[in-house]
Swiss-Prot record:
One Pfam family cited in the UniProt record for this chain: Val_tRNA-synt_C
Annotated domain remarks: ValRS has two distinct active sites: one for aminoacylation and one for editing. The misactivated threonine is translocated from the active site to the editing site. The C-terminal coiled-coil domain is crucial for aminoacylation activity.
Species for this entry: Granulibacter bethesdensis (strain ATCC BAA-1260 / CGDNIH1)
Descriptive protein name: Valine--tRNA ligase
A biological-process GO annotation: valyl-tRNA aminoacylation
Cross-referenced PANTHER family: VALINE--TRNA LIGASE, CHLOROPLASTIC_MITOCHONDRIAL 2, VALYL-TRNA SYNTHETASES
GO CC, one annotated term: cytosol
Quaternary data: Monomer.
Length: 896
């Protein structure tokens, strides 16, 4: 214990947090112990990007994880919370490319691959630790000695091993398929790196003449430039308008190519004209149609998003075909080509109408440009085959989703999963372990030497230029970080992991793929539970975005209030299956809770409360002592059950109620008169009980509020410095009849004082005014209780007397029910009863009027359908608050 004269007036988070964290870290408090006989508890950090900075999503995920691991550590489990960062292929490459540009240095392609990668590694060494420093500020008790990076040599070896294994099993292969192509970054990107943006554009209706000259068919498209690569027109097989045309052909304007009219259910008769142009090489749905009908798939765009004509043909010039115009499109940027094509179609009479049209266009989330579905040769993984055991594991209960509803999302994605494009046209990342011979043959091996040996020729093989999708290495995270494939000793102890805590947005991209790889490579699920949390929104329920100006910086909150209030606010709001509405006010409220705990501790210290070695709670005799011990047991039981069920909100609410209401508001207040008589046995018992319960409080709160609790634990001398983190989780004591009787008696006292305070508050009785309390219809035991606690009732309920009432109620009395008795508080002459009735009636009527307006709004189906979800939710919350006010005001009127 470090020495302090007395606790200061307030907890100074700035002076204590980093000091305490360093004490924990240097003392090995976070470290797992593989040699321990304790049951392991393993949880994997979702590795943040090495380029990242702490945002509220991180704060949510890591607060919940840290609360869980601190609790399990206190339960005596051998906790491994595995830290690390992701190499973040595109993000990191862009950061370093921008850095080179800002320095005026030559670009990536000018300096070459090796020099560029050296520069990335230097940047990582200099700046890549930013996010891990910020996680320390949050209080995350990660086992930093085991920190991993997805491009560490050990993890890279695991990546190569898995790639080679899957390739040899036929589960990784090369294919020419459509991918999301970013023309600016010039790489394939994952669906997670694509964001849909609403764009106000046009829907062009274009006339395609029938080959037999007997009319034409009209198609509608938002992308007329892709018509150069059309292979068919699709109509629904049951659309009577086009039944007679199925099997016939149209002549494609501009190129003059002959393309068929095919029947396919992809075409929606209710949408547009019901006829759809099919461009298999530039649309994912069209690609599927093309494969079903064995259509040609000419690509008309290069990797920079420019028109290329290498794969298409034109007929001679006719009134339909204009080969000279088409030839002139070669090399044009796609949107410039669009304008030219629309203009030429209009000149030739094929543009039927132009309709203003708002639609969603996929954009690269980093480049900001519209992505292009592009037919390219890439490496793919047979995700459908790998998904089958993952689906079965969830169906059987080997892996459990919490909340359970997320299982449906998991199943929906995995039962309709497409081949996973795992190659990226980048330099930063795990280079694909495939080598090519001069004749184009492919040799997949863990090393160049193995590939060369397999080839057997004298020519030097050339390694594939591409790197793997970042999610490929992330999918191996639960076992690659534990030493596989080189050393299985740690893996056998800590795998499978116990729980994964993450957001719903990466169930498919990360959770599902970890399950695929874990089951296929390790033959075990990677985690037993998957806890899915929602998004962090602002206090109005709106999604945070820079454009709205409502982004909350967690580090700014930590600087202003400390990590504890932010962490506690997050836990308090983290209910299952719902988003978190977090604003500065929530953190300020939690900061007041920290202050409440601190003030109670100051009170205890000033009244001589300190840990009593050998104190046995079973020996106490005072009803107040027995009551607070029973209440502490209730809190321990409820907090433990909540954490076991991942109900972080219930855990935090339990702690809040017990500390603020039970311990501070009632125990401390009821203990004050006893503590004034400093040398009595009663005072000694209350001090010992207070010290014991404060120790329980600090341990209960530690998972969510580690800094203030460790500070107080150290200060009071409950254990050596920095020892709360490994102190045992409190256990429920043995119940006995005396403790239960004390619980009933003090609970009765608390309810009586609470009812009187409510009446006085509702009736606007001045705090300085004492009022008598009359007990009508009270049984003998109630009267005896009132007598035993007369002084406390008088002090805390502002009562001039507490007596039984026989006969009629005094005129102008307020009433409240307490068990079998009626509490009567005479108010004649204390307040203006008529004025009070008028005030209460006026406030109730106003609340009713406001509630009626909100009800009308919520009953308006058009409002509910059109308004933003957060606005509808605000109105529902407002209605609930108004209904509570109406009930409260009605009850107050009934009291009169």
């Amino acid at each position: 214990m470090y020495e302090r004269a007395m606790l200061s007036k307030n907890f100074d988070h700035a002076a204590n947090e980093q000091r305490i964290y360093a004490g924990w870290e240097h003392g090995g408090a976070f470290a797992a112990n593989p040699a321990s006989s304790a049951t392991p508890f393993t949880i994997m950090i979702p590795p943040p990007n090495v380029t990242g900075s702490l945002h509220m999503g991180h704060a949510l995920t890591f607060t919940l994880q840290d609360s869980l691991v601190r609790w399990r550590r206190m339960q005596g489990r051998d906790v491994l919370w595995q830290p690390g960062t992701d190499h973040a292929g595109i993000a990191t490459q862009m950061v370093v490319e921008r850095l080179l540009a800002s320095e005026g240095s030559p670009g990536r392609r000018e300096i070459g691959r090796d020099a560029f990668l050296d520069r990335v590694w230097r940047w990582k060494a200099e700046s890549g630790g930013n996010i891990t420093h910020q996680l320390r500020r949050l209080g995350a008790s990660l086992d930093w000695g085991r920190e991993r990076f997805t491009m560490d040599e050990g993890l890279s070896a695991a990546v190569r091993d898995v790639f080679v294994t899957l390739y040899r099993q036929g589960l990784i292969y090369r294919d020419r398929r459509l991918v999301n192509w970013d023309p600016q970054l010039q790489t394939a990107i994952s669906d997670l790196e694509v964001e849909s943006r609403e764009v106000r554009g046009n829907l062009w209706h274009i006339r395609y003449p029938l080959e037999d000259g007997e009319g034409s068919i009209i198609v509608a498209t938002t992308r007329p430039e892709t018509m150069l690569g059309d292979s068919a027109v699709a109509v629904h097989p049951e659309d009577e308008r086009y039944t007679a045309l199925i099997g016939k052909c149209v002549i494609l304007p501009l190129t003059g190519r002959r393309i068929p009219i095919v029947a396919d259910t992809y075409s929606d008769p209710e949408k547009g004209t019901g006829a759809v142009k099919i461009t298999p090489a530039h649309d994912f749905n069209d690609f599927a149609v093309g494969r079903r009908h064995d259509l040609p798939m000419p690509s008309i765009m290069d990797r920079e998003g420019r028109i290329t004509l290498a794969e298409i043909t034109c007929t001679e010039a006719t009134d339909i075909a204009d080969p000279a115009f088409v030839t002139g499109l070669e090399g044009q940027e796609r949107f410039a080509a669009r304008k030219a094509i629309v203009a030429r179609l209009e000149e030739m009479g094929f543009l039927e109408t132009i309709e203003t049209h708002t639609h969603h266009v996929p954009h690269g989330d980093r480049s900001g440009v519209p992505i292009e579905p592009l037919l390219t040769t890439q490496w793919f993984c047979n995700a459908a085959e790998l998904a089958k055991p993952a689906v079965a594991a969830v169906e059987s209960g080997d892996t459990r989703f919490v909340p359970k509803q997320w299982e449906n999302t998991f199943f929906a994605w995995l039962r309709d999963i497409q081949p996973w494009c795992i190659s990226r046209q980048l330099w930063w990342g795990h280079r694909i372990p495939a080598w090519y011979a001069p004749d184009g043959s492919v040799y997949v091996a863990a090393t160049a030497e193995e590939a060369q040996a397999a080839y057997g020729g004298s020519e030097t093989l050339t390694q594939d230029e591409d790197v793997l999708d970042t999610w490929f290495s992330s999918a191996l995270w639960p076992f690659s970080t534990l030493g596989w494939p080189e050393d299985d000793s740690i893996l056998s102890r800590y795998y499978p992991t116990d729980v994964l805590i993450t957001g719903f947005d990466i169930i498919f991209f990360w959770v599902a793929r970890m399950m695929m790889m874990g089951l296929h490579i390790q033959k075990q699920v990677p985690f037993r539970d998957v806890y899915i949390h929602g998004l962090v929104r602002d206090e109005r329920g709106q999604k945070m975005s820079k454009s709205k100006g409502n982004v909350i910086d967690p580090l700014a909150l930590i600087e202003a209030h400390g990590a504890d209030p932010m962490r506690f606010a997050i836990c308090l709001l983290a209910g299952p299956g719902r988003d978190i509405k977090l604003g500065p006010k929530r953190v300020e409220d939690a900061s007041r809770f920290v202050t409440k705990l601190w003030n109670a501790s100051v009170f205890c210290e000033r009244n001589g409360v300190k840990p009593e070695p050998g104190f046995d709670p079973a020996t106490v005799t005072l009803p107040l002592s027995r009551w607070i011990l029973a209440s502490a047991d209730d809190a321990i039981r409820a907090a433990t059950q909540a954490l076991e069920a991942y109900r972080f909100d219930d855990y935090a609410a339990t702690c809040y109620r017990f500390v603020w209401n039970t311990f501070c508001d009632w125990f401390v207040e009821l203990a004050k008169p006893i503590l004034l008589a400093t040398d009595t046995p009663e005072a000694a018992e209350i001090k010992a009980v207070a010290a014991h319960v404060l120790g329980v409080v600090l341990r209960l709160l530690h998972p969510a509020m580690p800094y203030v609790t460790e500070t107080l634990w150290d200060h009071f001398g409950y254990g050596p410095e920095f020892s709360l983190i490994r102190a045992p989780w409190p256990e429920v004591g043995v119940s006995d009849p005396a403790r239960e009787a004390a619980r009933q008696e003090i609970d009765w006292l608390v309810r009586l004082i609470g009812e009187v305070r409510t009446v006085r508050n509702e009736m606007n009785v001045p705090p300085s005014t004492l009022t008598p309390i009359l007990l009508k219809d009270a049984v003998a035991e109630t009267v005896a209780r009132a007598e035993r606690w007369r002084d406390q009732i008088a002090r805390l309920a502002r009562a001039s007397s507490v007596t039984s009432l026989e006969g009629a109620l005094p005129k102008g009395s307020a009433q409240a029910v307490l068990d079998e008795a009626i509490l009567v508080i005479p108010l004649e002459g204390v307040i203006d009863l008529d004025a009070e009735r008028t005030r209460l009636t006026r406030e109730r009527d106003k609340a009713r009027d406001e509630a009626a307006k909100v009800v009308r709004k919520l009953e308006n189906a058009d409002f509910v359908a059109r308004a933003k979800p957060e606005v509808v939710e605000e109105n529902r919350d407002r209605l609930a608050a108004l209904e509570a006010d109406i009930a409260r005001l009605g009850a107050a009127l009934e009291r009169l």
